[in-house]
Amino acid sequence: MKSTLTAFALALAVAFAQPAPKPLPGDDLVLRAMREEMERSRQLRQTGLEMPYFLEYKLEDQESCSIGASLGGLLTVRQIHLRMPMVQVRVGSYDLDNTNHLAAGYGGGGVRYDQDTWPLDDSLQAFRQNLWLATDRAYKSAVEAFSIKKEILKQTNVTDPLPDFYRAQPFVKIVPGKLVPINGETWKTRTARVSTVFAAYPEIMTSGVELEALSSLSYYMNSEGSMLRYPDALTSLRIRAATQAPDGMTLRDSALHISFQGSNIAADADLIRSAEQVANNLRALVKAPVGETYSGPVLIEPMASAQFLGYLLGENIRIPRKPLAGPGRSVPFASSEFEGKIGSRVLPEWLDVVDDPTQTEFRGHTLIGHYLIDNDGVQPRPVSLIENGVLKEYLRSRQPIKGFPDSTGHGRLLAGFGANQPVIGNLFIRARQTKKLDALKQQLISMIQQRNKPYGILIRKLDYPSSASMGELQAIITSMVQSGGGGRPAPLPALVYKIYPDGREELVRGLRFRGVSTRSLRDIMAASEETAFFDFVNNSGPFAMMGSAGYLAATTVMAPGVLFEELELERSQEESSKAPIVPPPVLTVRKP
C-alpha cells in the first residue's frame, strides 16, 4: 500500500473544515511555513484515500547543553542546537482512527519525527519542503495503521467501544521571546567545581555532577485552529554519589537543583553545601546498622512525603487505556489502582488533592510544573482530583476514557499507540487538620509505647527520582516484585531512622517499602503544619530515573508530613558485589 501513496497523492488527500485562520507574526517563517502547508492541504481533495481529519505540526527550536564532571574533572561536554519537528496525521474520525491498537506502535502509526532534516537557518522554502515530506510519510503510516486496525476490529468483539480522540477547543497564543543562548563555558566551570567536593570523602566510590540545560522556542499548530509560539527554558543540576558498606551493600544519595523559565539556579555556595550533605549522608550510612523488617507506625517528613505521595498519587491518578490487540494476543499492561473508584474514599476526609499547572508561584516558590499547553495542544486547567478524601476526577489527555467528556490538558509524556500520557504538573496535597511536626513525632512515640514496640520509623528522604542506573533499577524492581506483599514497587527510602521511646533517633540502612499501594493512604492518621515543595523532572523511566532520555515533564509537588498508622518495610534483598579489598587512592583535596 505504501508504494501507491505518493507525496503528490497526500497533498491532494487532506480535506477538513477549519476555523478562520488567525493573523501571524509578520517575521516568523516557521509559523508561516506551517500555516501555508496546512492551508494548501486544506484546499485540496482526492477520492479513493482515507481522509485525514486531524493534522498537527510541532517544532522545538532548541539549544541544549549537557556536562558531566567528577572529582573536579570534566567527563562529558555536549552543546548542540537542533530544530526538532514532529508531524502527526490522524485518518478516519474522532470516533475511529489509526491509533490505540497494538500494530500502531509507539507513535500511533501517524507520527513522523525528522530531527536531522530541518535547517538551522531560516528558509521558508526549506521549511515547507520538510513539512510536506514529513507529512507525506506520516500520512502513509497512518493509512497503513488504520487499515490494520479495521482488520483487527473485524475479528474482535469490542463490548464497550470508546472514541479514539477527544475534541478540543482551539487555543491561540503568541508569546514574545527568542532562543536564549546557553553559556556552556560558565557551566563547565561551575559543574567541575561542585564535583571536587567528593575528593574529601575517600569512602565514596563513585560520584558525579551532571548539568542539563535546555533553551527552546516552541511552535505548535493543528488543523483545529490552535497555534502557539512560546519560549521555554529548564536547567537541572544533579549531584549523586554511591558507595558500599563493609558488607557490600550498595548505598546511594543524590540532590537535584532546578531552575525554570530563566529563574536562577542555586548559587555555587549552596550547590557545594548540597554536595557536602550528600557525601555526609553516605558517610553516615556506611557506619549505620542494617534495618530490620518492620510493621507499624511510620512518620514521613514533608520532603519525603512530597516524594512518596507525588509518586503514589501521580502513578494512579490517571487511567491508562489498553490498546486493541486482537483475539489471542496479550498486552503487558499496568492499570491504575484508582480505576473504578470515582466517588470512593481514597484518603482521610481532611485531605484534598488538586493539580494546577496554571499557577506559576505559590508562597514564594516558583512552580516548575507550569505549562501553556500539553503535548496534545490542549490548554491545561486546574483539576480537583480528591475532595474531602473522595476521588472526583482523573487527569486526562485527549485519549478518551470512560465517563469523562474531554481532556484536562495533562497529556505531557508519550504513552505509545498514538496517545500521550497524562501526568501531574503542580500537585497540591492539602490538609485541613494539622499538627506541628514535633507533635507528630511525639504522637509516633506514644503509639509505639501503647503497642509495646521497641521503636517506630521516621523517613526523611527517598531516592526519587532514582539515582540508580537502569540495570540496578531493573534488579531492584524485580526483587521487590518477587518478595511479594502486593502493591506496586515504590522508590527506595534513602534516609530512615529508628525512633525510640526516649526520642532518640538512629539511622539505619537497607530498608525498602513492602506492600505499598494506594490503599495504604487510608492509614494516614495525621499531617504536619509544615509543608515542603519537591521539584523534579518526570520522564518515562522507572521511578523518574535521573538522566532518562525522552520527553520531560517538569513537576512540583507540595505536601505536608504524614503519620501512617501502619506501613511495612523490609530488608533489601538485591545481591551485591563484595567491597573493594584494596583501599582507595589518596586524592588531592582542592577547595571548591
Regions from the language model: what does each represent?
Residues 135, 358, 376-592:
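Long, low-charge, small-residue-enriched segments that form tightly packed helices used
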Residues 6-16:
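Hydrophobic helical h-region of N-terminal Sec-dependent signal peptides
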Residues 4, 169-170, 415-419:
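Short, flexible, solvent-exposed loop/turn segments with mixed acidic/basic and small polar residues
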Residues 16-382, 387-390, 403, 514-526, ...:
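Active-site bordering "gate/hinge" segments
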